[in-house]
Amino acid sequence: MESVFLESDLVSLSPLTVEDYSESYLNWLNDEEVNRYSYRRYFPITKESLEKFLREISNHSDEVQFSIRRKKDLVHIGNICLKSIHWQARCAELGILIGDKSSWGRGFGTSAVGLIVKYGFLRLNLNRIEIGTFNPSAVKMFEKNQFQHEGVSRQKIYIDGAYHDDIKMAVLAEDFFKKIKL
């Protein structure tokens, strides 16, 4: 595990590296329930493909990937990233996965999102961070972190024999700075 880079009362974020590989991490990526709201659910992840991803992730200049660890015991419970960073437009997409099911609904995701949004605006000088999701719990988590609804991509996701809308949300730096105390 890399040293802690960002932390809150609940979680710490560290750069995601090959040392983060574990059987439990691999199992998350292949767990149908964990990936219910992910496109990756249709493609099996092998040990080799995960290790390759972890080796190569630091070579990408348009994304930053972090492991999410519970602060109390530093157990790796998920990952969070800013990806598709457009440096000129100063915007990025946010991605998050809480793979440890025992950590669901306990505020870890909300806390990790708060940390990475603050990092994106204060350290990377971004102006906009956006997401697309059709996970109702994720929508609530993003709303808690000042994300605003911007639109819907109708019937974009096909899962379990039905189409689902993809909710588009974003937070702007100006809105973030109005509500936080630095």
Regions found by a protein language model. Give the residues of each.
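Conserved G/P- and acidic residue-centered "switch" motifs that form tight phosphate/ATP-binding loops
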Residues: L74, G107, G161
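Short hydrophobic/aromatic beta-strand or adjacent loop that forms the aromatic wall/cage
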Residues: E63, H164-K168
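A short, well-structured alpha-helix characteristic of acyl/acetyltransferase catalytic modules
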Residues: M1-E51, D175-L182
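Conserved acetyl-CoA-binding loop-helix of GNAT-fold acetyltransferases
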Residues: G105-Y119, V139-K144
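Conserved active-site tyrosine of GNAT-family acetyltransferases
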Residues: F142-F147, M169
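Acetyl-CoA-dependent GNAT
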Residues: I45-S102, L172
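Conserved catalytic-core motifs of GNAT/GCN5-like acyltransferases
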Residues: E130-G132, Q148-H164
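Conserved GNAT acetyl-CoA-binding A-motif
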Residues: L122-T133
